[in-house]
């Protein structure tokens, strides 16, 4: 699933039954990326990534 939130590009995908991969980009800059051993749905994890973007926008120094 790909989308935009507060100007950032968010990507969340399910890789097999066990893992979710995720990435957040702001103007081509990778804010965060990785994987999670989660049973959450892609849509639920995408919503969680919105809170990560909110934190990044409030505290960009924490993501340098």
Predicted features, each with a name:
Residues 1-18:
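Short N-terminal "domain-start" leader segments
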Residues 10-12, 24, 53:
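Hydrophobic aliphatic residue packing
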Residues 14-31:
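Short aromatic-glycine-(Arg/Gly/Cys) micro-motifs in beta-strand/loop hairpins
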Residues 29-64:
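Mixed-charge, Lys/Arg-enriched low-complexity segments
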């Amino acid at each position: 699933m790909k989308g935009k939130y507060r100007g950032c590009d968010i990507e969340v995908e399910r890789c097999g039954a066990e893992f979710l991969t995720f990435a957040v980009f702001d103007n081509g800059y990778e804010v965060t990326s990785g994987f999670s051993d989660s049973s959450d749905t892609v849509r639920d994890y995408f919503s969680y990534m919105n809170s990560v973007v909110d934190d990044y926008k409030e505290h960009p120094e924490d993501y340098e």
